[in-house]
């Protein structure tokens, strides 16, 4: 009898290098205890929970009772599509958990502090006849029993979806552009985009990175512009704030080779700001920017 050993490959623990750690010194969200106590009793879908938490962070996270946002801002926070965000916000507003008022291209959203108005349970999904009170069945479709017919129907649906995919993509893009007329650069799906000023800021950072690392690859300007937009819309940083902090980092003996994109700048923003305010040591690469001369901002800040 031979001795054998079974080798079990456990899944690797996924760790992000330089992962983020929660720290109260970086800020916290102040929410009334009454709201926190009532939240566990809410019967919400996953998407509704995501959007509800996003509304809480966009308001109470910034010590505000309400905020002006677009569906895209919440979509970026939650990873949901604009349509799913719109549906979830509508459901939350109908149940009086939040208030949502359309204002031009934006929405004013906030948590409804009248907790007695909250509808804790999900509404019934079945439609009822006015007089009899009878509900429609959940599914009025009777599927065929034969395998051949089912297979045929399935393939017909696939062909139909394939034929209409281009049309729906064009429709989504047109809808995106009508909702975000300021978009100067964007992906075909509209998931990533930026304004003309966001693009100029991204180009300016790219030109500075090129001075530090001349052999670096050309960046994806749509992705960089999108990150600049997120810093502006979600983090409340102005283009001038972004350029000024990157200028400081690009001259610092350590950060100049570690902050080479808007993404890394955003990730290390708080740490960079603290070091800059504390007068951290820095070493200039090239004296390209003089804070006493605002000509450096021409074309970036308008």
From Swiss-Prot:
Keywords: DNA replication, DNA-binding, Early protein
Pfam families, per the entry: Phage_rep_O
Disordered as annotated region, ranges: 1-20, 152-172
GO BP term, pick one: DNA replication
Low complexity bias spans: 152-163
S-S bonds: none
Single annotated GO MF: DNA binding
Record-annotated DNA-binding residue ranges: 71-90
InterPro entries for this protein: Phage_lambda_VrpO_N, WH-like_DNA-bd_sf
UniProt biased composition (Polar residues): 1-15
Family: Belongs to the phage O protein family.
Note: Presumably, its N-terminal half determines specific interaction with the replication origin on the phage DNA, while its C-terminal half binds specifically to the gene 14 protein.
Protein role: This protein is essential for phi-80 DNA synthesis.
Protein name: Replication protein 15
């Amino acid at each position: 009898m031979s001795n054998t050993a079974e080798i079990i490959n456990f899944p690797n623990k996924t760790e992000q290098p330089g992962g983020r750690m929660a720290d109260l010194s970086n800020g916290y969200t102040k929410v009334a205890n009454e709201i926190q106590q009532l939240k566990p009793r809410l019967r919400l879908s996953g998407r509704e929970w995501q959007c509800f938490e996003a509304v809480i962070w966009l308001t109470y996270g910034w010590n505000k009772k309400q905020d002006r946002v677009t569906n895209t801002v919440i979509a970026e926070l939650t990873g949901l599509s604009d349509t799913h965000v719109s549906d979830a916000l509508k459901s939350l507003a109908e149940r009086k958990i939040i208030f949502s008022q359309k204002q031009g291209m934006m929405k004013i959203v906030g948590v409804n502090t009248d907790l007695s108005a909250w509808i804790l349970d999900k509404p019934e999904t079945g439609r009822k006849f006015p007089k009899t009170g009878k509900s429609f069945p959940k599914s009025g479709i009777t599927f065929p029993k034969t395998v051949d017919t089912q297979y045929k129907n399935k393939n017909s649906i696939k062909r139909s979806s394939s034929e209409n995919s281009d049309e729906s993509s064009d429709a989504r893009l047109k809808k995106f552009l009508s909702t975000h007329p300021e978009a100067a650069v964007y992906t075909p799906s509209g998931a990533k985009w930026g304004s003309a000023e966001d693009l100029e800021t991204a180009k300016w950072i790219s030109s500075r990175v090129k001075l530090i690392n001349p052999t670096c690859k050309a960046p994806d300007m749509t992705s960089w512009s999108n990150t600049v937009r997120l810093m502006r819309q979600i983090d409340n940083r102005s283009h001038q704030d972004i350029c000024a902090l990157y200028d400081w980092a690009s001259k610092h003996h350590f950060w100049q080779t570690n902050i080479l994109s808007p993404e890394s700048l955003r990730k290390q923003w708080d740490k960079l700001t603290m070091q800059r305010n504390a007068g951290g040591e820095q070493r200039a690469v090239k004296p390209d920017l003089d804070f006493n001369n605002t000509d450096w901002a021409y074309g970036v800040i308008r």
